[in-house]
């Protein structure tokens, strides 16, 4: 049975948006989160989507030289918090978790979401939060892999085809209790484990992580031409 929306309102929910990265694949000079789509920056769109949920607050982990984020007309600006980001995404997330620990309970839930995913739907956000809260678990949005996957060696030679039946493409947000996620990331970093997302840290710590099926339009803006695709998706979602 699908949980009701009121279950979310009984739990304190926070969000973290790591936004300190250089985004070198997008541009050597322009930060993708500050590119404009329909008169709003990507970051404004992202924050607006997350605020479709009833958040206690959200933390933006930004570069110490970033003078843009704090001056943006973000939705629910009174709920915005800022902390110093790190060299890597995982460092930014950990800094934000440590910041949250000073104002929130370790039992509160936190959603970690990429700054450059402005198209996540409210229905997916609700489904993810409801699932984690109902089952007291960690979870991520993900979609089944559709394309045939090839393993390649020596740059261009296919060595084998990968069975995709049990493969899912991870997205964000990813959700866990603040204390659980902070412990998992600290443990992984102490043991020099490469962390690519929150789920990988939780997995290393032995925690269960479930997938909640997301949507293919929850794209991450990585390259210049992704901006136009994101614009089209945002327009289609309004219609």
Curated annotation (Swiss-Prot):
Pathway: Isoprenoid biosynthesis; isopentenyl diphosphate biosynthesis via DXP pathway; isopentenyl diphosphate from 1-deoxy-D-xylulose 5-phosphate: step 2/6
Catalytic activity: 2-C-methyl-D-erythritol 4-phosphate + CTP + H(+) = 4-CDP-2-C-methyl-D-erythritol + diphosphate
Pfam families xref list: IspD (PF01128)
The keyword Membrane is annotated on this UniProt entry: no
GO BP annotations listed: isopentenyl diphosphate biosynthetic process, methylerythritol 4-phosphate pathway
The keyword tRNA processing is annotated on this UniProt entry: no
Enzyme Commission (EC) number: 2.7.7.60
Site (Transition state stabilizer): 25, 32
Site (Positions MEP for the nucleophilic attack): 164, 220
MF (Gene Ontology): 2-C-methyl-D-erythritol 4-phosphate cytidylyltransferase activity
PROSITE patterns registered for this protein in UniProt: ISPD (PS01295)
Enzyme class per UniProt: transferase
Biological function: Catalyzes the formation of 4-diphosphocytidyl-2-C-methyl-D-erythritol from CTP and 2-C-methyl-D-erythritol 4-phosphate (MEP).
UniProt cross-references to NCBIfam families, sorted A to Z: ispD
HAMAP family: IspD
Protein name, entry field: 2-C-methyl-D-erythritol 4-phosphate cytidylyltransferase
Organism annotation: Acinetobacter baylyi (strain ATCC 33305 / BD413 / ADP1)
């Amino acid at each position: 049975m699908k949980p009701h929306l009121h279950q979310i309102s009984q739990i304190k929910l926070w969000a973290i948006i790591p936004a300190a990265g250089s985004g070198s694949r997008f541009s050597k000079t322009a930060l993708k989160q500050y590119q404009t789509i329909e008169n709003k920056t990507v970051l404004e769109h992202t924050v607006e989507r997350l605020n479709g949920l009833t958040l206690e607050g959200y933390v933006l982990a930004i570069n110490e030289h970033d003078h843009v984020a704090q001056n943006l007309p973000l939705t629910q600006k009174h709920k915005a918090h800022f902390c110093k980001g790190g060299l890597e995404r995982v460092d930014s997330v950990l800094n934000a978790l440590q910041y949250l620990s000073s104002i929130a309970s370790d039992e509160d839930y936190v959603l970690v979401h990429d700054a450059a995913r402005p198209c996540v739907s409210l229905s997916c956000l609700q489904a993810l939060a409801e699932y984690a809260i109902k089952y007291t678990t960690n979870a991520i949005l993900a979609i089944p892999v559709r394309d045939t996957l090839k393993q390649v060696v020596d740059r261009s030679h296919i060595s084998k085809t990968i069975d995709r039946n049990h493969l899912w493409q991870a997205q964000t947000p990813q959700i866990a209790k603040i204390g659980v996620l902070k412990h998992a990331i600290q443990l992984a970093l102490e043991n020099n484990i490469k962390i690519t997302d929150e789920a990988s840290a939780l997995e290393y710590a032995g925690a269960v992580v479930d997938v909640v099926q997301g949507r293919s339009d929850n794209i991450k803006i990585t390259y210049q031409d992704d901006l136009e695709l994101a614009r089209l998706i945002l327009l289609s979602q309004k219609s």
